[in-house]
Amino acid sequence: MPKKEKKAKTPLSDEEQLLLFQQKLLTEEEMAKKKERLLSQFLKDKLAKEEHNSALNLNKINTQWRTVLREVKTRELHKDIEILSQTFERVVDCKDNVIKSLAKDLSEAEEQYARALRSHLHSVDQLLALQRHRLSLLEESYNMELEALTKEFETERKTIIDQHEKEIHYLQDIFMAMEQNYIDSEYESKLEFQSMWNDLKNMNLEEKHFLRLHLENIVEDLWRKFQDVLKNYTDATEDRKAAFETLQVKDEKSSKEIEVQMKKIQKLQDAITISKGKIMIHSRESEDENRYIRNDKELVLVQLRKLKAQRTQARAASQKNLVKLTLESNATLKALRKIVDKGEKILKLAEICRKFETEEEKVLPFYSSVLTPKEQEGIEENNLEELTEELAKVMVDYTGMENFWKRYNKVKLEQLSLQHRRAQLLDINGKLREMLKQYLDGISVSDEVLSQLNPLFIVNYQSNLPQPLSIPIAHPGDKQHPTT
């Protein structure tokens, strides 16, 4: 011990004191952290224990509270079920009575339906017979009109063809006569030209023959003189010179005579040219006449073409009218066939819909007008003011359809009323389904129900739902409407 005290009293250095102080701080920090960990663990355990105890207590409270609420809700539901059972029994009794009355009405309606069906079939047979008779009359009238039109067309066609043939023969005769006149005039002009040509030719030949004879005589004289001169030339030169001079003079005379003869020939040629000019003039005149004749011929041919075109147009128009007539007749037959098919379809639909008619409709199929006599007279006066003659004639043919349109309008009104009633019943059904859903949600427990407003959650005797609609208690005298 003394040794220890001695050691303790030994002085420590600064470093050792610093280390010792740091160790103390570390130990203190570790102790503080350990205390914090222990304290947090203690608090967590205590919190978990408290949560467990609170959940257990809450479950116990909910279990006990649910039993109390179920008992209260059970009593309320028993009361509601008793009321609903009473109303259901009353409704069932009413339905039974209605079924019995409907069965009785059904038997009576079947008897009336049989009677009405027999009368309706009889009337339908009469209408069909009337319609067939009308169709036969229409077909006969159509056939008669068609036959008359075909006869008229054939007669008109025959007259047009005869007229055309007559005109063709007439034009051919005119053409042949004009051609014969042209041939005759041409032949006469040729004869005249040939006669003039022969006359001129004969005159020319005569003048040539005369000149030739005259010139031959002159040449013979000259030849004789030349022989004499030649003979004399042989005799003496002087005589030849004198003879040469005389011959020269004679030559001049002969040249003058030749010039005179040439002038005559020129005159003859001028006469020939004049005659040729006359011939040309006659030929031009004949050409003009021929041109006029050709123009007349062309005009006649143009008229012939026009007549042919008119004939073809008339033939095409008649053929077009015939085709149009056949098409219209076929369209009329198809329209009549469609009307007959539509009538048969309407009759079939009437037979099918007859089983849906009520007893009143079978007994009185055509309802009387709901208008007063004054209102009916006012409507008729307004209709008469607005109607035209053609529309009045058309309406007379359809007076038998008034009863049909009455029944059609009645069925249309009943259809609209049933659609309106169906919409009302669907609305009531939706409301009842909503109420039933709310009721089932009130007696069932699920996550969806718990997430919504629920009458089971009651605090201080107050629910989180609004007050439910009070179910009316039916009395024996009240009328019950059937629900769908």
Curated annotation (Swiss-Prot):
Residues 92-160, 374-403 form a coiled coil. One of its GO terms (biological process) is cilium-dependent cell motility. It comes from the Eukaryota. Signal peptide: none annotated. InterPro entries: DRC1/2_N, DRC1/DRC2. Belongs to the DRC2 family. This is Dynein regulatory complex subunit 2. The gene is CCDC65.
